[in-house]
Curated annotation (Swiss-Prot):
Family to which this protein belongs: Belongs to the ATP-dependent AMP-binding enzyme family.
Gene source species: Tapinella panuoides (Oyster rollrim mushroom)
Matching InterPro entries: AB_hydrolase_fold (IPR029058), ACP-like_sf (IPR036736), AMP-bd_C_sf (IPR045851), AMP-binding_CS (IPR020845), AMP-dep_synth/lig_dom (IPR000873), ANL_N_sf (IPR042099), PKS_thioesterase (IPR020802), PP-bd_ACP (IPR009081)
Biotechnology: Atromentin has been shown to induce caspase-3 and poly (ADP-ribose) polymerase (PARP) in human leukemia U937 cells. It also has anticoagulant activity. Moreover, atromentin has antimicrobial activity. It acts especially as an inhibitor of FabK, the enoyl-acyl carrier protein (ACP) reductase of S.pneumoniae.
Database matches in CDD domains: A_NRPS_TubE_like
EC number assigned by the record: 2.3.1.-
Protein name, per record: Atromentin synthetase
Family annotation (SMART domains): PKS_TE (SM00824)
Function, in words: The L-tyrosine:2-oxoglutarate aminotransferase atrD and the atromentin synthetase atrA catalyze consecutive steps to turn over L-tyrosine into atromentin, which represents the generic precursor molecule for the entire terphenylquinone and pulvinic acid family of pigments, which are widely distributed secondary metabolites in homobasidiomycetes. The first step is catalyzed by atrD which converts L-tyrosine in to 4-hydroxyphenylpyruvate (4-HPP).
Length: 957
């Protein structure tokens, strides 16, 4: 009989290891309050360090354990003055690690229960629904937040909102004893509440007691081999169990010094992770699969960085949150060896892990030296449970029958680190456990020889770059697509071989006959609509869309489609005939509208398009749109380069590719260049980035660099919804003078906007510098009697003149170089004082030498072109030096991210709030992820577009 797939870790007792490691006579602390006091008394000079979201120079602020202990006990005393009953829940909604950390410990010491709130939804309806839900769940509505959070809560009545800054001010008035507690806690008291993602409905509140957290921390410390000499680097938000329990409380128990970095700093500049490992002698850090992939993608060609970092201290890199692609992890290890100053001393292990909010984060790990051991599977195995944790694989139907070793089934875990219940939700708690105290994780796994790996999911979510998206919500919207039979649609998570992140497949029964004469047209329209909805909700289209006749889609006895069964059939090839029929119909639909390239220029461009998109030349129509085929801003550079080489042209302006993305249109433009047609060089500020859809068009004004490439990836999200136009500054093409004043620019853009869209209502937005231009264009249109229903101002204050006067030629050049990724943020900051003493030519030469060769090639830059671009940006700065805002528009929506300087709160309250004076209607201030220069980049644009489109809809567009 085959052994059953049940496994527990027989390792030595970690409690004994803890006592030996920290040399404590007091023993293991019984509560978190005891844990903090013990760490303070034993390691008073060890440090908690922080890099905030506003630390643009990555400067580190540090507090000793002793200093931090005094700070939070003073805060606890101030909290006690609120006179809240013991055990009342306080929703902690803060941004920075130190603030969150301080607030949580203060609540614990005051006898209150902190609940960590992740970022609230930008969708007003969803935000209000969530807040109403947790208010009902907790029976109270006490929030501790900052100014930005208070603004988000301002429209919701009945909340007891307290500012953390006020609490700090109160705490500074007194100094309590170093062992002060307002109320004593017991091991089984509720300690901290964590909200689940809510991807399958409203969030549940996971209850962790002092006992479960301490048990988890002891086990983690043993697995990580923590000692008081260990240095930890964490960038995961404190509202996540990994950021708070795994990377703060567990290390604190063992006396480890810690560096907590705001996520935006790492995600916008992954090199910072390596610099900090080097500078702070970091032993343990964390990087999920998407960050490993990003670092490999961004740095593998940076030969200039080889040997630049001392990475010898690093001994473990944790990875979790999504499956880790084996080849990505191996490439990451190889990359760090190349970047290491002494490759032979770069010897760390990658620890892929499994964990959930309910398990106090990671509870199963596979710690592997990938330089010595090659992975056996496409994704890294997840290994064995930490001490005290058990795992087993059972039949998912009954949740109890053990599966044999090597057979897939439902993964269940149990142990002293598992949560005790969902707050005020006995039904959900009961359904999450089976007899024997086994917790149902909702994942499909396989255990072979004590080593676990995941093979799928039972729960209805898709994880894209570590972000969880709900399948049921997607299905609800897809059910409304014309061509889909209601209740006969299912979506299932799916990861294709070699894919770096999870995706999904959509199965549906069409309302039309798949064998009918009009099937190709109807199926093409239906699939396009399914893709559009999916991209807007999940940030990516389905990997496959499979139409199945309704009589062949089996439902359960409860009248539901089985996602698991459909996906199994798909993977095994049982649905191959339906996939083939869909491909045949799509091909027929394409053939019906196919226009064969006729001129030599069209044929040449069709061949170039085909090469870029891995098509045959005869598959490209003369009416094919470069961006609808999937073209990105990087692909534009390749098209430009190959087109210039084929046609023997010194320059095909990128702007003209953006304006003429259709094969026949671009061929006509290129023909004009070849034949020196003067009309091909006329200035038109409008760049149509996508033209499909019948909703009100959106017009975007360029940032201070004058170019519109930043908008290319954003425009894709508006396909089949509304046209997307961008304004490009004058002066890029030969013979085009720079704008001489703000008024001249506004007049040009307003006239072009009216020519493109003769009547309102209008929608306009501007990024950075473009925000004030958009505001002025909106005013001009209103003065013409037109209605402007949306004015979007992205991370720009109304008063810019002082800033324009601050930017000298060197600063403007470095801003442009950083914006174009020619230099790093750190380089741009450090170089300014050094370059100011040089001539312009010498300054450009320094930047040119620092620029990555592949980036220069991508942008088709030369020193002369860079110099000219700096001049264009300088002309826009000159236009802004005398700008003084006045008048008003119907309403403004101000989107704000982490600013170039200062804190986000000061940026909002002191710089952006004055827009209220220029808005007749109620202005809206909307927090968006990322930093000033990264909020629309590849990593942030999926979230930005959802927030931005939500505001368009809120304004009735």
């Amino acid at each position: 009989m085959a052994p059953t797939a049940v496994f527990s870790n027989p390792a030595t007792n970690p409690v004994a290891n803890l006592k030996a490691s920290v040399k404590t006579a007091e023993g293991v602390p019984a509560t978190l309050n005891d844990l903090l006091l013990q760490a303070t008394e034993m390691y008073p000079s060890h440090e908690l360090s922080f890099i905030t979201s506003s630390a643009h120079d990555s400067s580190v602020q540090a507090r000793t354990f002793q200093d931090f202990n005094q700070r939070v006990r003073n805060l606890a005393s101030a909290l006690a003055a609120w006179k809240k009953p013991a055990g009342e829940v306080v929703v902690v909604y803060l941004t920075e690690h130190e603030d969150n950390m301080s607030a949580v410990w203060a609540c614990l010491l005051a006898g209150l229960v902190p609940c960590l709130q992740p970022a609230l939804s930008a969708q007003q309806e969803h935000k209000e629904g969530h807040i109403a839900h947790i208010r009902k769940l907790f029976g109270s509505a006490t929030w501790l937040t900052n100014d930005a959070g208070a603004m988000q809560l301002d429209t919701i009545k009945g909340l007891d909102v307290h500012l953390f800054s006020d609490l700090l001010a109160s705490a500074e008035k007194s100094s309590v004893a170093a062992n002060y507690v307002a109320r004593q806690s017991q091991p089984d008291d509720e300690a901290i509440l964590f909200l689940t993602s809510g991807s399958t409905g409203f969030s549940k509140a996971v209850v962790h007691t002092h006992r479960t957290i301490i048990n988890a921390c002891i086990a983690k410390g043993a697995n990580y081999r923590l000692t008081p000499q260990t240095n930890i680097l964490n960038w995961v938000g404190f509202d996540h169990v990994a950021g708070s329990l795994e990377m703060h409380i567990a290390p604190l128990l063992y006396g480890c010094s810690q560096l907590h970095v705001h996520a935006s700093a790492i995600l916008s500049d992954p090199l910072l992770l390596l610099r900090l490992i080097d500078e702070r002698s970091i032993d343990i850090a964390f990087a999920p699969n998407f960050l490993l992939a990003k670092m490999v993608r961004d740095l593998e060609k940076r030969t200039d960085l080889h040997g630049k970092f001392d990475l010898s201290s690093l001994r473990r890199m944790n990875s979790g949150g999504e499956a880790v692609v084996s080849k990505t992890a191996v490439a990451f290890v190889q990359l760090l060896k190349k970047l290491g100053r002494n490759p032979s001393k770069v010897s760390f292990k990658v620890a892929a892990g499994f964990g959930m909010t309910e398990t106090c984060a990671g509870c199963i790990y596979d710690v592997v030296d990938l330089a010595e051991n090659s992975p056996k599977h496409e994704f890294l195995a997840l290994g064995a449970p930490v001490h005290g944790c058990e795992m087993r694989i059972v039949d998912p139907e009954d949740g109890a029958t053990p599966r044999s070793d090597g057979q897939p089934g439902e993964l269940q875990v149990r142990g002293p680190m598992i949560f005790v219940r969902y707050y005020n939700n006995p039904e959900a708690t009961k359904s999450s456990f089976v007899e024997g105290g086994w917790y149902r994780t909702g994942d499909i796994g396989i255990i072979e020889n004590g080593n676990m790996r995941l093979s799928g999911r039972i729960k209805d979510t898709v994880i894209v770059h570590g972000v969880s998206y709900g399948i049921p919500e997607l299905e609800t919207y897809l059910q409304t697509v014309q061509g889909v039979t209601h209740s006969f649609l299912a979506a299932a998570p799916y990861r294709a071989p070699g894919q770096e992140t999870e995706g999904f497949v959509v199965f549906y029964a069409p309302t039309f006959d798949l064998q009918g004469d009009d099937a190709s047209k109807k199926l093409s329209e239906t699939h396009r609509a399914i893709k559009d909805v999916s991209v807007k909700m999940m940030t990516l289209p389905p990997q496959h869309i499979v139409p199945i006749p309704m009589d062949q889609m089996e439902k359960t006895t409860l009248g539901k489609l089985s996602r698991a069964r459909l996906l199994s059939q798909f993977v095994q090839g049982a649905l191959a005939k339906h996939v083939a029929r869909a491909e045949e119909l799509i091909s027929m639909a394409r053939g019906a509208s196919f226009v064969t390239p006729s001129t030599d220029d069209e044929k040449a461009l069709a061949a170039i398009y085909a090469g870029i998109f891995n098509l045959q030349s005869n598959e490209v129509s003369a009416r094919d749109n470069f961006f609808e085929l999937g073209g990105t801003s990087i692909d534009v550079i390749r098209l430009k380069r190959e087109g210039e080489a084929h046609f023997g042209l010194s320059e095909i302006p990128i702007i003209q590719i953006l304006k003429n993305p259709i094969v026949s249109d671009l061929a006509k433009y290129v023909n004009g260049l070849v034949n020196n047609d003067a009309s091909a060089n006329e200035y038109d500020p409008i760049v149509p980035l996508q033209l499909s859809g019948d909703k009100t068009p959106i017009f975007f004004v360029h940032p201070g660099v004058g170019e519109v490439l930043i908008f290319v990836n954003l425009a894709k999200y508006f396909q089949n919804e509304r046209p997307f136009y961008a304004f490009r500054a004058r002066g890029f093409e030969p013979g085009h003078p720079f704008f001489g004043s703000m008024d001249e620019m506004v007049t040009s853009y307003a006239n072009a906007m009216k020519k493109t869209q003769p009547k309102g209502p209008y929608a306009i937005a501007g990024y950075s510098y473009g925000g004030v231009v958009a505001f002025e264009v909106a005013k001009r249109l209103e003065s013409m009697g037109e209605e402007v229903k949306f004015v979007g101002l992205i991370n720009i204050p109304p008063h810019i003149a002082d800033r324009m006067h601050e930017i000298d030629w060197t600063g403007g050049m470095l801003n442009l170089a950083y914006f174009l990724s020619l230099v790093t943020k750190q380089d741009a900051t450090d170089l300014h004082p050094k370059l100011k003493t040089m001539t312009k030519e010498e300054q450009l030469e320094v930047v040119w030498k620092l620029a990555p060769p592949e980036r220069v090639t991508e942008l088709q830059l030369t020193p002369g072109k860079l110099d000219h671009w700096v001049s264009i940006a300088g002309s826009l700065i000159e236009c802004g030096k005398s700008y003084n805002p006045g008048g008003n528009v119907s309403a403004v929506d101000v989107f704000y991210a982490i600013p170039l300087k200062g804190s986000k709160e000061d940026w909002l309250n002191k710089q952006l709030k004055p827009w209220s004076q220029f808005s007749r209607g109620e202005p809206q201030f909307i927090d968006v992820p990322g930093q000033h220069y990264t909020l629309m980049d590849f990593d942030h644009v999926p979230q930005f577009q959802k927030i931005f489109r939500g505001r368009l809809e809120a304004r009735g567009l």
